[in-house]
């Protein structure tokens, strides 16, 4: 057996009737439609998975920022608590000599933790970060401003993105004072 006998068919092609072109076209169309449908289904499933992953990352990021701000507040409280016992004998000595001056010293000790609190920028504030993210994703600024107005948010915040977010600092203090924690948040959304 030589190589040419392997490539030649054993059937005489002149005796075989031609294949119907219409039937061939229909077969290829069905094949292409099924492949397209399978690829679309796969793409839709992967898009859903990516959206869920992005949402879980966003919630994890928000929780992380809340925990960091809470921990930053706790570490400052620990420092002030550590500083208070070391200065307690001094306050007692001052209290014996002059009661009004001890009140002044205590007030200055309380003011120091407020000076060292970490501030979150407006663009990093979880309440406003979605608007800055929309701008990064290519949404027109006019559309973002309209959404902010519809949600009752001041649109001038977009211009002040690098300024510290004062409402965030106040809300984090409110959480600490009320005893609420981030453990009350759940992923059951």
UniProtKB/Swiss-Prot annotation:
Pfam families: CCDC53 (PF10152). Probable component of the WASH complex. Component of the DHIC (ddl-1-containing hsf-1 inhibitory complex), which contains at least ddl-1, ddl-2, hsb-1 and hsf-1. Within the complex, interacts with ddl-2. Within the complex, interacts with hsb-1. Within the complex, interacts with hsf-1. Formation of the DHIC may be dependent upon the Insulin/IGF-1-like signaling (IIS) mediated pathway. It comes from the Eukaryota. Disruption phenotype: RNAi-mediated knockdown positively modulates lifespan; effect abolished in hsf-1 mutant background. Increases resistance to both heat and oxidative stresses. Increases localization to the nucleus and also DNA binding activity of heat-shock transcription factor hsf-1 both before and after heat shock. Increases in transcript levels of heat-shock protein genes sim-1, hsp-70, hsp-16.2 and F44E5.5 after heat shock, but not in unstressed conditions. May also increase levels of post-translationally modified hsf-1 under heat stressed and unstressed conditions. Acts as a component of the WASH core complex that functions as a nucleation-promoting factor (NPF) at the surface of endosomes, where it recruits and activates the Arp2/3 complex to induce actin polymerization, playing a key role in the fission of tubules that serve as transport intermediates during endosome sorting. Acts as a component of the DHIC (ddl-1-containing hsf-1 inhibitory complex) which modulates lifespan by sequestering the heat-shock transcription factor hsf-1 to negatively regulate its binding to DNA and its transcriptional activity. It comes from Caenorhabditis elegans. Belongs to the CCDC53 family. Residues 76-101, 150-189 are annotated as: Disordered. Expressed in pharynx, intestine, body wall muscles, vulva muscles, spermatheca, and several head and tail neurons. Residues 150-165 have a biased composition (Basic and acidic residues). The keyword Coiled coil applies. Keywords: Coiled coil, Phosphoprotein. PANTHER family: PROTEIN AD-016-RELATED (PTHR13015), WASH COMPLEX SUBUNIT 3 (PTHR13015:SF0). GO terms for cellular component: cytoplasm; WASH complex. This is WASH complex subunit homolog 3. The gene is ddl-1. Residues 35-74 form a coiled coil. Residues 167-189 have a biased composition (Polar residues). The modification Phosphothreonine is found at residue 182. Phosphorylated. Phosphorylation on Thr-182 may promote DHIC complex dissociation and consequently the activation of heat-shock transcription factor hsf-1. Phosphorylation is modulated by the Insulin/IGF-1-like signaling (IIS) mediated pathway. One of its GO terms (biological process) is exocytosis.
